[in-house]
Amino acid sequence: MRVKEIQRNYQHLWKWSLIILGMIMICKAIEKSWVTVYYGVPVWKDAETTLFCASDAKAYEKESHNVWATHACVPSDPSPQELVLGNVTENFNMWKNKMVEQMHEDIISLWDQSLKPCVKLTFLCVTLNCIDVKNSTNNNTEEATITNCSFKVPTELKDKTETVHTLFYKLDVVPLNVTNNSSISSTYRLINCNTSTITQACPKVSFEPIPIHYCAPAGFAILKCNDKKFNGTGPCKNVSTVQCTHGIRPVVSTQLLLNGSLSEEEVIIRSENITNNAKTIIVQLNETVKINCTRPGSDKKIRQSIRIGPGKVFYAKGGITGQAHCNITDGEWRNTLQQVAIALRRQFNNKSIIFNSSSGGDIEITTHTFNCGGEFFYCNTSELFTGIWNGTWDKNCTSTESNCTGNITLPCRIKQVVRTWQGVGQAMYAPPIEGTIRCSSNITGLLLTRDGGNGKCNSK
């Protein structure tokens, strides 16, 4: 989408031009010529303007998107209008889009405002004495990913401290000295303490996205490309104008795109430069794939409260839960991956398409990262991105085959200390959530990278 501004070459005639334009649109509505008048007089040009947001946010909700949108956005239009521009061709470039940049800035603002009143956890940047808690052969719990740590915290009396014990995920701590036997107590620190200020997310605050509409101010309109096979750059011959976009959920995830919009026809491949393997490939699916994720609860209390001085509480992990995981129907996923391979093969001159898991990097890149019910999941997707397509699929699946009616289970790990992707030097501590957590999403797209050789694609 692009924002266009009406060019004001004759400022003293502007009021009259609006009145005349309105009259022409009313009087000529049944004729075809009015489109030319609307689009050509006055002249439209590219413009950089600040859009405003609209939403159906509920003031009584404590969810962060609702809180932010209640103050930052206007109510959404119950009957939005769209005007098709006949015989109009416009150039679009989704990779250089001011509206997308503004959306990013708004999400940064949302997270910043959500964390401002919350407790800074500078006291956690101390030496942690930790020992593994794995003492059983039960693989259905998260014991192997947990360490039990003791450290000193401030009390109500400024000159006194006390020692407390709590559980941390191993992904959240870094050893200061490595020992050969992992069961022996060792010293650690929190993973982001050397680079970031850590803020604890306020209790009873969640991050479940709601649809946000972006709207053009008076004198501007948003141009929308309606070509069903548009690849993101170049001319678009099916153009319309809208005052506001459709509702966009600001979902933050990696590798798999969740709860987005679908292609109306075939799978669409988009890249700023498909021949440059450093550029991300965005795949828009034409059918959703359901992904169901669970973190089982526990009989024991999962969250414990630790006082860290006057009026401040640190919500620590106090119990072990079941192993977090996600399920995807095998047959649905294989059929989807086949359609993606066919679309990719058209881009790469019918070369064989080989799917592999991520080739390395930060955990946010090597796993499918997303928020599920307030916990941050990091799921291993190596079972998803595997297979070769060279005109035939080496892993054919239909719903009637016995080995494809089951689920692909993705083991997931959880982090509580999360780097806020929108800012440098900032990290968030997500307090543990009590009870069983479940979330169900629709996979509507993929993020892929291509290696430097053939048609080999890695998840990103």
From Swiss-Prot:
An individual GO BP term: virion attachment to host cell
UniProtKB keywords: AIDS, Clathrin-mediated endocytosis of virus by host, Disulfide bond, Fusion of virus membrane with host endosomal membrane, Fusion of virus membrane with host membrane, Glycoprotein, Host-virus interaction, Membrane, Signal, Viral attachment to host cell, Viral penetration into host cytoplasm, Virion, Virus endocytosis by host, Virus entry into host cell
Any one of the GO CC terms: virion membrane
Gene3D superfamilies: Human immunodeficiency virus 1, Gp160, envelope glycoprotein
Signal sequence interval, chain numbering: 1-31
Protein name in UniProt: Truncated surface protein
Region: CD4-binding loop, residue numbers: 358-368
Subcellular location: Virion membrane
Region (V2), start-end ranges: 149-193
Organism for this UniProt entry: Human immunodeficiency virus type 1 group M subtype U (isolate Z3) (HIV-1)
Disulfide topology: C53-C73, C118-C202, C125-C193, C130-C149, C215-C244, C225-C236, C293-C326, C372-C439, C379-C412, C397-C404
Region annotation V4: where it falls in the sequence: 379-412
